[in-house]
């Protein structure tokens, strides 16, 4: 799974994901991509699950680029523990994704196969996405 090697801080504050993405809203590497319609936090496990689904659909053909990286640790306390006694330990990693950001790009496959893979990926993701093509 994706996670950073080291970070400046071990624990992060909770914050909201607002706004529209401006610098990663265009396809840069491939002909096809998956673009977000809403903003959310996407866990590293979800990114890995989507990557596996797309790879399986392509049957090892084509190339996949993952344009997001989970760099924010989400902390949590164990079950049945009383409140207080400090913030919990880091549990998993997420990436904040704004509306309009490109999540995945792919190339070297037919448009029909790319569209099917995008539909499968959309079912795994916790946000609404749409399929985009380089024009």
UniProtKB/Swiss-Prot annotation:
Keyword Signal: no
GO CC, alphabetical: mitochondrial large ribosomal subunit
Gene responsible for this protein: RPL16
InterPro entries in the cross-refs: Ribosomal_uL16 (IPR047873), Ribosomal_uL16_bact-type (IPR000114), Ribosomal_uL16_CS (IPR020798), Ribosomal_uL16_dom (IPR016180), Ribosomal_uL16_sf (IPR036920)
Main location: mitochondrion
GO molecular function list: rRNA binding; structural constituent of ribosome
Protein source organism: Prototheca wickerhamii
UniProt keyword terms in alphabetical order: Mitochondrion, Ribonucleoprotein, Ribosomal protein
Pfam families assigned to the protein according to its UniProt record, in alphabetical order: Ribosomal_L16
Gene3D superfamilies referenced in this protein's UniProt entry, alphabetically: Ribosomal protein L10e/L16
Family statement: Belongs to the universal ribosomal protein uL16 family.
Name of the protein described by the UniProt record: Large ribosomal subunit protein uL16m
GO BP: any one term: mitochondrial translation
Highest taxon listed in the record's lineage: Eukaryota
Compartment(s) where it occurs, according to its Swiss-Prot or TrEMBL record: Mitochondrion
């Amino acid at each position: 799974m994706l996670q950073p090697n080291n970070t400046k801080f071990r624990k992060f504050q909770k914050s909201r994901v607002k706004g529209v993405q401006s610098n990663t809203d265009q396809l840069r590497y491939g002909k096809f991509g998956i673009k977000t319609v809403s903003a959310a936090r996407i866990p590293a496990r979800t990114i890995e699950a989507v990557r596996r689904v797309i790879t399986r659909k392509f049957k090892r053909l084509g190339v996949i680029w993952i344009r997001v990286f989970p760099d924010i640790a989400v902390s949590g306390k164990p079950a049945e523990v009383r409140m207080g006694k400090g913030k919990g330990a880091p549990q998993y990693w997420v990436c904040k994704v704004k509306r309009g950001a490109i999540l995945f790009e792919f190339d070297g496959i037919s448009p029909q196969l790319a569209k099917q893979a995008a539909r499968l990926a959309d079912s795994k993701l916790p946000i609404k996405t749409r399929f985009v093509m380089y024009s």
